[in-house]
Amino acid sequence: MFMFFINIIFINNFLNNYKTYIIYIYIYNKWNNYNKNYNYNYIMIMITMGLNITCEQTVMFNPYYYLLYYMYIKMLMLMLMLYYIMLYYIMLYYIMFMIMLYYMIYMTL
């Protein structure tokens, strides 16, 4: 769940400041121990800072929007699950009905 939240943060380059990126990159490199090029990440931070300066409007971090996005995705997933469950039961009852019909026809012959 925490890694999912980190991914949500990393796909945005304009909703967080560079300090947040430094913290998350430090955590990522600490837990990982495969990536040894620590300088590349900070170069990327400098690039994102430059792009943030070129932006005409900066938005401060507000978790409400992240929660809204998370809830939206959760609702989509729930609807999808319910759809497939409904499909499963509809197909089940359809097959049962066809078997029953076939059985009735077979018994009447």
UniProtKB/Swiss-Prot annotation:
The keyword Mitochondrion applies. It is found in: Mitochondrion. Keywords: Mitochondrion. One of its GO terms (cellular component) is mitochondrion. This is Putative uncharacterized protein Q0144, mitochondrial. The lineage of its organism: Eukaryota, Fungi, Dikarya, Ascomycota, Saccharomycotina.
